[in-house]
């Protein structure tokens, strides 16, 4: 019987943070849960970051993932937006790290290429492929992106483990 691994995928954002938990058993993937965390937009930045941190911590306790994966920051035209996204990423990464989980980071283009086959895929294409790869899953764009990040990690962790076993 194949070892079962749970992966928490995180699509970071200060307004909407998508999350998804998948189970990997050999080459089989299945969705466990997914959703979106929405910090109060009127709250100060520190409170919104604490909301993200606490929410991810709750997800780790509730779903018991073995590993986590998050989308890397990308270069935005607006430096202030990029900095705030970096804060959100840090808050989201710290909770699983604090629980002792390894946290992998993947570029958005690699996630899209891993799930759709092209790094230039749009959100609708990612969501459609997530629905195919995880049958019965109907996720919003942010949650679908998080599930895609988890799927990307499942593929890359398997390739890494196969490479190290050779």
Curated annotation (Swiss-Prot):
Protein's UniProt keywords contain Cytoplasm: yes
Q: Which family does it belong to?
A: Belongs to the RuvC family.
Q: What class of enzyme is it?
A: hydrolase
Q: What is its EC number?
A: 3.1.21.10
Q: Which UniProt keywords apply?
A: Cytoplasm, DNA damage, DNA recombination, DNA repair, DNA-binding, Endonuclease, Hydrolase, Magnesium, Metal-binding, Nuclease
Write out the annotated subcellular location: Cytoplasm
GO terms of molecular function: crossover junction DNA endonuclease activity; DNA binding; magnesium ion binding
Q: Does the keyword Nucleus apply?
A: no
Family matches, as CDD domains: RuvC
Q: Which reaction does it catalyse?
A: Endonucleolytic cleavage at a junction such as a reciprocal single-stranded crossover between two homologous DNA duplexes (Holliday junction)
- Listed binding positions for Mg(2+) 2 are 71
Its GO biological process annotations read: DNA recombination; DNA repair
The name this protein carries in UniProt is: Crossover junction endodeoxyribonuclease RuvC
Recorded hits in InterPro entries, A to Z, give: RNaseH-like_sf, RNaseH_sf, X-over_junc_endoDNase_RuvC
Please describe what this protein does. The RuvA-RuvB-RuvC complex processes Holliday junction (HJ) DNA during genetic recombination and DNA repair. Endonuclease that resolves HJ intermediates. Cleaves cruciform DNA by making single-stranded nicks across the HJ at symmetrical positions within the homologous arms, yielding a 5'-phosphate and a 3'-hydroxyl group; requires a central core of homology in the junction. The consensus cleavage sequence is 5'-(A/T)TT(C/G)-3'. Cleavage occurs on the 3'-side of the TT dinucleotide at the point of strand exchange.
The lineage, from the top, is: Bacteria, Pseudomonadati, Pseudomonadota, Alphaproteobacteria, Maricaulales
